[in-house]
């Protein structure tokens, strides 16, 4: 990844908290906790996931590479959602936590020598992916943000359409993500 691409990735990571705050501004307590389907996350669960992934997945894994540690720690985000009570969390507090953790992550990336980010990661590969460089993780970090941004937008659109039934919203076009997964 060139320095220009790394700079683009840092900017994308920097903008994510403001994008989320704008998207979720004014969302009431009920809407923050509405799951578009029983096996899908609500908006507050998505934000809690992003907050915790910030330091326990992407940030932690970049640190492993920068510090030359031996391996990545195993994570279980699905378990975190239940054990940490994501569904009952405060959306404003989760957003603030995400923003603070993202600022810490951006400071870490700003101080990281690019040659260390380019180095291949832990001596034990990450599952089927094999060894990863810090730059691989930065690219995945941006993709992860965007995957969950799309998930959040789809959840909000589907929840909105359900909440306002029997009004018909199909004139807007197809709502992202089918109601049955």
Regions found by a protein language model. Give the residues of each.
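A short small-residue
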Residues: 1, 78-86, 125-128
């Amino acid at each position: 990844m060139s320095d220009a691409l790394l700079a683009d990735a840092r900017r994308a990571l920097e903008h994510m908290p403001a994008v989320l705050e704008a998207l979720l501004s004014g969302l009431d307590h009920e809407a923050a906790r509405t799951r578009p389907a029983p096996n899908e996350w609500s908006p507050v669960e998505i934000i809690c996931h992003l907050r915790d992934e910030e330091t326990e997945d992407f940030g932690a894994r970049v640190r492993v590479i920068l510090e030359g540690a031996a391996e990545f720690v195993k994570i279980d985000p699905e378990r975190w959602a239940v054990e940490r009570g994501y569904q009952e969390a405060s959306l404003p507090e989760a957003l603030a936590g995400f923003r603070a953790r993202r600022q810490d992550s951006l400071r870490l990336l700003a101080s990281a020598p690019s040659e260390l980010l380019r180095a291949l990661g832990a001596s034990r590969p990450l599952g089927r992916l094999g060894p990863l460089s810090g730059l691989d993780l930065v690219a995945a970090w941006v993709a992860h943000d965007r995957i969950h941004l799309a998930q959040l937008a789809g959840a909000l659109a589907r929840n909105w359409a359900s909440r306002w039934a029997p009004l018909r919203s199909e004139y807007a076009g197809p709502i992202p993500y089918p109601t049955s997964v």
